[in-house]
């Protein structure tokens, strides 16, 4: 069976892993790194850049460099108000869906399309490593992702040309990686603070069984928020001193964001860091520079509210699991933001335990996804994963109330049904409004979609019996069916959420991505051809110089002619001609080289024939003969 990879599509960085020889292996990307920045950019010539190369040019191209896209995926425009102020690129929220605007590409992209580019790169890098095309993947998502966000992640995989075999929760994936070899039963709390989201899951792990007891989280809390605290501090100090708000300058904002991330990382190991941003802006008085010292204590003061927000999901998960903190055996830290000392301190303070840091927080989720991929591919045996749905699911009933059919933390896959009736005499149809959330009123919860059941025979109110069935699959994705028991009429909906893409949009994006992949391949081949031609020109000129008079004037002229033709073809970017002349130039060089060897061979042969007569005449005298004296060693 083909290999199934695990891809951790992170807010800040992404990672891919695979099972090899019964063990999970992290696959380095084409650049040699084990993680890849989740960044996609469009250059002025419309070239698409992904990963490290995209991140490096962000300062010079802030409006066409897309990062932290995971915070927009599967969300409606009214759900991303806070995120809009944290990015330098333009986010269009005027329609029914969030769109990311690229002036260089001349079009708008859905967040799923941008995420798909990161997934495609990781899949291609994995394909090169494995020597076979990767088409199947397991993709983890934050445990607190709602149905729309899960479906959107699956759509991103489809656009990338991947069959997403399973969507699993990130803390659960981390627990798989941590507990793969655990024999004794342990209760573990996974504290997953990534770049854009925060999850807490409580699990029982042992003898190959991974049972999620409860999960909680905050999808608006992550490393990006810590960065923003530093950005606001730097911008505020600069505005205080210079009267200029750097946040209004896209390029300056991008530089501040990069400096903030760097400072945050440095403060995990140092007690203070210098932030120097020369020429951050300019006025009529000349250039302005930003030069500040940020201490760890000041950073912790700035981020104190964020650190406090970490408490609530931990307390909620423990409560839902019906456990006391003293009953937790291990605290496993996941996500790059758990390297922040203040975060580690609050975990220790809350639990009274030293956090377990035996796993790499940047790689553990991808490793767990690879293990799940191994389970699905039949490579890994004797593992049972029992995950849960993070939020309650239900329908709107009379009076605008949410009636829950599936409570949060229900083990999945699951199926639940409830029988409802009509609210008016003679009512022949009902509208089913599907909701997700914990509030009592329907309007306070997340709307996942609506559908109508028609053809109900007229009857007094309360008489018709309408069965509503909720089915959650192993991916945590919901299907809802409504059936009138009297007439047998049935209607169903696969919930995709108002903010995600229609099937037609996904299909179009898949075709666009395939076309772009072909264009990218052609562009890469052209670059490789130009590089090959440039190298050949250099080597040919060097070889002619070294050979000098050893080749005939005709051969030299022929090679020089092809070199000039190749230079002209390169200037004109005539790739067919470049290909043709490369071949002709190589043949001319081979011919010139052969003639030099033939000439050298002929000269050596002539010298060999003349050699014996000259040597015998010179040896006839004994003027040059030296007698050696030997002494016998005893």
Curated annotation (Swiss-Prot):
Residues 621-634 have a biased composition (Acidic residues). The keyword tRNA processing does not apply. The modification Phosphothreonine is found at residue 197. One of its GO terms (molecular function) is unfolded protein binding. Gene3D superfamilies: 1.20.1270.10, 3.30.420.40, Actin, Chain A, domain 4 (3.90.640.10), Substrate Binding Domain Of DNAk, Chain A, domain 1 (2.60.34.10). Residues 600-634 are annotated as: Disordered. Residues 600-620 have a biased composition (Low complexity). Induction: By stress conditions e.g. heat shock. Pfam families: HSP70. Acts as a chaperone. NCBIfam families: PRK00290.1, PRK05183.1, prok_dnaK. Belongs to the heat shock protein 70 family. This is Chaperone protein DnaK 2. The lineage of its organism: Bacteria, Bacillati, Cyanobacteriota, Cyanophyceae, Synechococcales. The gene is dnaK2.
């Amino acid at each position: 069976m083909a290999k199934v990879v695990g891809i951790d599509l992170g807010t800040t960085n992404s990672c891919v892993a695979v099972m090899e020889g019964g063990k999970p292996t992290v696959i380095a990307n084409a650049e040699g790194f084990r993680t890849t920045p989740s960044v996609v950019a469009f250059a002025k010539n419309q070239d698409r850049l992904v990963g490290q190369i995209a991140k490096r040019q962000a300062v010079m191209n802030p409006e066409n460099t897309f990062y932290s896209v995971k915070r927009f995926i599967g969300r409606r425009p009214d759900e991303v108000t806070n995120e809009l102020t944290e990015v330098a690129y333009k986010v269009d929220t005027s329609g029914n869906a969030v769109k990311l605007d690229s002036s260089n590409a001349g079009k708008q992209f859905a967040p799923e399309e941008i995420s798909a580019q990161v997934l495609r790169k990781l899949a291609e890098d994995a394909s090169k490593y494995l020597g076979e095309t990767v088409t199947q993947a397991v993709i983890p998502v934050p445990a607190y992702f709602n149905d729309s966000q899960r479906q959107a992640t699956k759509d991103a995989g489809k656009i990338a040309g991947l069959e997403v075999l399973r969507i699993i929760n990130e803390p659960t994936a981390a627990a798989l990686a941590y507990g793969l070899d655990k024999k004794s039963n342990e209760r573990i709390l996974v504290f997953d603070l990534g770049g854009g989201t925060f999850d807490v899951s409580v699990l029982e792990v042992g003898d190959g069984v991974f049972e999620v007891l409860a999960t909680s989280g905050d999808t608006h809390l992550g490393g990006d928020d810590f960065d923003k605290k530093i950005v606001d501090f730097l911008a505020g100090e600069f505005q205080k001193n210079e009267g200029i708000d750097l946040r209004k300058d896209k390029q300056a904002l991008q530089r501040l964001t990069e400096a903030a991330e760097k400072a945050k990382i440095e403060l995990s190991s140092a007690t203070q860091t210098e932030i120097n941003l020369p020429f951050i802006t300019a006025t009529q008085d000349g250039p302005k520079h930003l030069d500040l010292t940020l201490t760890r204590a000041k950073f912790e003061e700035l981020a104190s509210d964020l650190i406090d927000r970490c408490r609530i999901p931990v307390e909620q998960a423990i409560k839902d699991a019906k456990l006391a903190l003293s009953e937790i055996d291990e605290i496993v830290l996941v996500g790059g933001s758990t390297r922040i000392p203040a975060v580690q301190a609050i975990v220790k303070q809350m639990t009274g335990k030293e956090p377990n840091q035996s796993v790499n927080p940047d790689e553990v989720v991808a490793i767990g996804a690879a293990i799940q991929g191994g389970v699905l591919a039949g490579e890994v045996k004797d593992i049972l994963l029992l995950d849960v749905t993070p939020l309650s699911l239900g329908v709107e009933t009379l009076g605008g109330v949410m009636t829950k059919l599936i409570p949060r933390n229900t083990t999945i896959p699951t199926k639940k049904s409830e029988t409802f009736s009509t609210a008016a005499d003679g009512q022949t149809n009902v509208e089913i409004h599907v909701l997700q959330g914990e509030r009592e009123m329907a309007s306070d919860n997340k709307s996942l979609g609506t559908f109508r059941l028609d053809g109900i025979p007229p009857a007094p109110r309360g008489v018709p019996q309408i069965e509503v069935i909720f089915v959650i699959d192993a991916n945590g994705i919901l299907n809802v069916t409504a059936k009138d028991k009297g007439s047998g009429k049935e209607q169903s909906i696969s919930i995709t959420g108002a903010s995600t893409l229609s099937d037609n949009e996904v299909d179009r994006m898949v075709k666009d991505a395939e076309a772009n992949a072909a264009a990218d391949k052609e562009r890469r081949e052209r670059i490789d051809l130009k590089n090959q031609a440039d190298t050949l020109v250099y080597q040919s000129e060097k070889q002619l110089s070294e050979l000098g008079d050893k080749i005939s004037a005709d051969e030299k002229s022929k090679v020089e002619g092809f070199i000039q033709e190749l230079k002209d073809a390169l200037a004109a970017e005539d790739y067919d001609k470049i290909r043709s002349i490369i071949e002709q130039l190589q043949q001319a060089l081979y011919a010139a080289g052969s003639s030099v060897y033939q000439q050298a061979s002929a000269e050596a042969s002539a010298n060999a024939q003349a050699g014996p007569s000259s040597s015998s005449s010179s040896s006839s005298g004994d003027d040059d003969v030296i007698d050696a004296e030997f002494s016998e060693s005893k």
